[in-house]
Amino acid sequence: MSKITEQVEALIQPVLNDLNFELVDIEYVKEGKDHFLRISIDKEGGVDLNDCTIASEKISEVMDENDPIPEMYYLDVASPGAERPIKKEKDFYNAINQPIFVSLYAPIEGDKEWLGVLKSVNDESINMEVKEKAKTKEIEIPRNKIAKARHAVMI
């Protein structure tokens, strides 16, 4: 997490708590000449457009008061969607028995990307049930090899 996203998280977490929203992700990026602060929120039962609008207004107030970002930026508050990122420890535990997609720094069994059902999580690794051709098998992936993980929609 960058210094800016850490500062933003510290500022907006109390606001989101008051609104009963969970902070899923913060991303501060430059695209072309524009900067974007993207904040993903969620709550029990999911968020709708009205929830995102309310959160955006409250976050804007706090950001304007404290001004942690020196350049102009666009604020985007949205739902994390069906393929929400899995970043925090609790995200992995909440994803047990759900389909996930994992991208790795280095290949395991010849592949750097795995799609399957998360079966278990511990401090060192995750276990996924994956399909390989017509067979189902379980693989263990060390946590330190995971570059990115997200929920997945399997059809």
Curated annotation (Swiss-Prot):
Main location: cytoplasm
Residue stretches spanning the membrane: none
GO CC annotation terms, alphabetical: cytosol
Keywords noted in UniProt: Cytoplasm, Ribosome biogenesis
CDD domains: YlxS_C
Organism: Staphylococcus epidermidis (strain ATCC 35984 / DSM 28319 / BCRC 17069 / CCUG 31568 / BM 3577 / RP62A)
One BP term from GO: translation
Record's keyword annotation contains Ion transport: no
Entry protein name: Ribosome maturation factor RimP
Family annotation (PANTHER family): RIBOSOME MATURATION FACTOR RIMP (PTHR33867:SF1)
Top-rank lineage group of the source organism: Bacteria
UniProt entry tagged with the keyword tRNA processing: no
Xref: NCBIfam families: PRK00092.1-2 (NF000928)
Gene3D superfamilies referenced in this protein's UniProt entry, alphabetically: Ribosome maturation factor RimP, C-terminal domain, RimP-like superfamily, N-terminal
Family that this chain belongs to: Belongs to the RimP family.
Function description: Required for maturation of 30S ribosomal subunits.
Subcellular compartments: Cytoplasm
SUPFAM superfamilies, sorted: YhbC-like, C-terminal domain, YhbC-like, N-terminal domain
Protein encoded by which gene: rimP
